[in-house]
Amino acid sequence: MMARRDPTSWAKRLVRAQTLQKQRRAPVGPRAPPPDEEDPRLKCKNCGAFGHTARSTRCPMKCWKAALVPATLGKKEGKENLKPWKPRVEANPGPLNKDKGEKEERPRQQDPQRKALLHMFSGKPPEKPLPNGKGSTEPSDYLRVASGPMPVHTTSKRPRLDPVLADRSATEMSGRGSVLASLSPLRKASLSSSSSLGPKERQTGAAADMPQPAVRHQGREPLLVVKPTHSRPEGDCREVPQAASKTHGLLQAARPQAQDKRPAVTSQPCPPAATHSLGLGSNLSFGPGAKRPAQAPIQACLNFPKKPRLGPFQIPESAIQGGELGAPENLQPPPAATELGPSTSPQMGRRTPAQVPSVDRQPPHSRPCLPTAQACTMSHHPAASHDGAQPLRVLFRRLENGRWSSSLLAAPSFHSPEKPGAFLAQSPHVSEKSEAPCVRVPPSVLYEDLQVSSSSEDSDSDLE
C-alpha cells in the first residue's frame, strides 16, 4: 500500500505549492508587516521613517506599489473664514457709520450758506448745478474768490529803470570783473558806460573807489588803460602806445602798486586763444611788490604762455635803481646776446636817463598771473660792428638768491656823433657804474647761469 502512490494526488500537491509560491512573490495588495519587523528604534536611511531599515520591504523607496498615498484630513469649517465681510443692516448702523454720516451731512448743510455769502461779497450770480447732480464748485473754491481787490501780477513785463541808474549799475558791474572773463562782456560794459553817460554824469555818477576801464577805438592801435586811483598817484601810470600784432592778444589784468618804493614795470599781454585774430593790444602798468592783489578789476588771459618774449621794439621799461643790489659782474657780455641791430639803435639813442630799460631776472613770486621777468629779444647778428657804431653795453648783477639781473647801459653816441657827451652828462650815475672796478666772468659761464635762471622762472611760473 505504501509503495503504491496515486499520481493524481501528487500532481495536485505540486500545483498547489507552485501557486502559493507565486502568491508570496507577487502580493496583490498591501500586507500588514509581521510584528517582529516593527522596531521603533530603527530608522530608515532612505525615507527617514522609524520602524524599519533600508533593507526592509516596508520602505516605500524600494516598493512604490506598496506605498500608501497620504489621505487628506477632513475640512475644519470653524477655523476658516469663508465670508470675511458681511454688510451691516442700515437699521442698526455701527458707531463708525454714524460719525461718517454726520460728517457728510454737515458740509451739505453749509453749502447754501456759503454760496449766499459769496454771492453777497463778490456780486456774481450763483452757478447753476450740472445736470448729473454734481456741483461745479470744489471745496477750495471759496479761497480762490477774494472779497478785496486782487493783486496784479506782471511777471512778463519788468519795470524799466532810469537810464542813468541802469548805466551806473552797468558801470559798477563792469568794475567787478572776474578773473576769467571773455571779450564781449567787458566791451559791452565799457561801451555802455562811455557812450550813455553825459558830461555831467561822468563827473558825478562814476564811482570814486572803483577804477573805470576805457576802451579806445580810434586809429589802428586800440589800447586799454587802467588807472587805479586809490592806491597810487596818476604820475606813476604811464601810457605808452604799442603796435597791435597777432602775437599779442587782448587784456591782461592791472594790479595796483602796493609798495611805491619799487619802480613800475610795463608788461605785455599774453595772447588768448579766442581773441587771437582780433589783434587788440593792451598797455597796462602794475606794481611788482604786492603779495596779495588789491581790490581792483583783474582781467586775466585765458591761455598763459610758458615763456612770453618781447620784440625788439617792445622793451619793458623800469628804473635802473632796481638793479643796485650787488656789484657789477660784467660790463660787456657776449655780442650774440647783448648787441642790438641797426633797427633798434635810434630808439635807444633818444631815451632819457629815466627811460633806460632794464630787465629783471628775478622770478615774480607775488604775481601768479602776469610774469614781469621777461627777456628782451635782441638781434643775434653783430650788425653794429660793420656800421661803425659801438655795441650796446649790458650790466649783469648777481643777486643774493643766486639769480642774475641785467640792465641796459646806453653807449656814448649812436646816431648823434656831434653830441658825444650829451647822454653822459645827463646820466652821471651810469658812467660811474661803468668806471667802477668789476670782476671779469667768462661769457660761457654767464650765459649758462642765465639759462638756468630762465628755466627756474618757467618752473616757478608753472607751479604758481
From Swiss-Prot:
Ranges of compositional bias, category Basic and acidic residues: 74-89, 97-114
Bias (Low complexity): 180-197
Coiled-coil residue spans: none
Chain's gene name: FAM90A14
Annotated spans, Disordered: 1-42, 70-389, 411-437
Name of the protein in its database record: Protein FAM90A14
Short name of any one Pfam family annotated for the protein: zf-CCHC_6
Positions of disulphide bridges: none
